Amino acid sequence: MTKNINNIIGWGISKEKLHSKLSDGTYKLQTLDIDFGTKCSLHCPHCFKSKFNQNESKGNALTFDETKKIILQAKELGLESIKILGAGDPLENEDFLDFVKFNSSLDIHTCVFTKGHILGNDELAKKYNQKYGITNARDLAKELYNLKTSILLGFNSFKEDTQLDFVGLPKFDYYNYRESALKLLIELGFNSFKENTATRLALICAPYKLSNIDEVFDIYKFGKEQNIYVAACPSTVSGMGHSEQEQIQKQKGEFYNKSIDLYTKIYVWAINNGYVTKEDFEKDGVSLYPGAHICNQVAAGLYIIWDGKVMVCPGLDGADAIVYEDVRKKPLKEIWIDSPNYQRAGMIDKFNFQCVAREKELFNNDNFYSIVYKKVLEAIQ
């Protein structure tokens, strides 16, 4: 028996729910990745959003009302969860709490990707939430705790200098803000253990690079031992992740070999300590996120970016990743049914969809997952 549910509420789709249908036979749209706002005071060099995607000057950004209409359409298609990915840090959007409250009123769980600086600083929490009467970070975190939310906190390193490199602000007191945010979220119980229930707190060690790859196992262990989900993976192949991918190619041999060792070490430890069962690993294989839930959102949802484009997922941003040009111009049900992700929803015997973007671009189709799978099984025999 595992010690906890190896997932975070609102992200991984369970075997019982994946490939499920509506009463009319349509495969359910169970989850959405979505951009909500573009403001961000950080300058992460690996950001999966290109700089031009954070520029609203074109005037075609989705409004709050348009976003709510999309959610209402998705609810009719079976929507249960939303992940707010960007385009900026969602907690820098003054309408953020209204959006989360709207989702909660529809019984939709919201996963919030954030670097934590707003939740770690009273002045920043007040700055973006004055209209709600919130004056400090604790009140903001309490409000989120009382709503249907999970917090996915950016966490690339235990080391201050390394972490500051990942947010691009060497003179900013970000590291201490992040530490304060993590402490606060733990104090409020986002990671409290509940029988047969996933946690509501995650550490997102993404991307990992050669500069922090030697810390990833320790971050994973630190999180799991506190009932905190941990998701680590290489760079996306989107936005400024393209330049990261180019750098990885220059370091190909070292990065590839260290990644194999990292994934293997995490899985062996997770299996030996009851966080992943041997049976599940043998059946499901290696996840994009080592030791974490299988990545399968591409068979249950879509990604809607700030200007209305509908994408396959956040991992790619090329023309072949665009499902539809503007979600405002066509019913969401039609977009969903016509999408390649809907075809994946019909692959009823498949659970693990790994990550085509990273496997192809970063690992050059070198059977990365199968190599890790074999090494893990050899180590745990």
Regions found by a protein language model. Name each.
Residues 55-58, 93, 121-123, 162-164, ...:
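Generic domain-boundary/flexible-linker signal
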Residues 2-142, 147-149:
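Conserved alpha-helical substructure of the radical SAM core
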